[in-house]
């Protein structure tokens, strides 16, 4: 199974926030995920990013790839 760390959209119309989740790369954006490791809220100033660094490091160590957006916001 190819795993990827990516964002899944939550919230309501025109007020999105995102969960940072680990999922199978073949699944759709908002379908089931393996584990939720944080969240990202771009609608507040400043943007809020909270990530469980230990779990992110674990998933990277077992071969999970980061999506472009997750790689950018977790720097």
Swiss-Prot record:
GO terms for molecular function: structural constituent of ribosome. Keywords: Ribonucleoprotein, Ribosomal protein. Gene3D superfamilies: 3.30.1320.10. GO terms for cellular component: cytoplasm; small ribosomal subunit. The keyword Protein transport does not apply. It holds the Pfam family Ribosomal_S16. SUPFAM superfamilies: Ribosomal protein S16. Coiled coil: none annotated. GO terms for biological process: translation. InterPro entries: Ribosomal_bS16 (IPR000307), Ribosomal_bS16_CS (IPR020592), Ribosomal_bS16_dom_sf (IPR023803). Belongs to the bacterial ribosomal protein bS16 family. This is Small ribosomal subunit protein bS16. It comes from Campylobacter fetus subsp. fetus (strain 82-40).
């Amino acid at each position: 199974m190819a795993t990827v760390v990516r964002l899944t959209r939550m919230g309501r119309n025109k007020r999105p926030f995102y969960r940072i989740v680990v999922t199978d790369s073949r699944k759709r954006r908002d379908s089931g995920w393996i584990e939720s490791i944080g969240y990202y809220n771009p609608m507040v100033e400043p943007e809020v990013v909270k990530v469980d660094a230990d779990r992110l490091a674990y998933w990277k160590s077992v071969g999970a790839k980061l999506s472009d957006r997750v790689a950018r916001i977790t720097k």
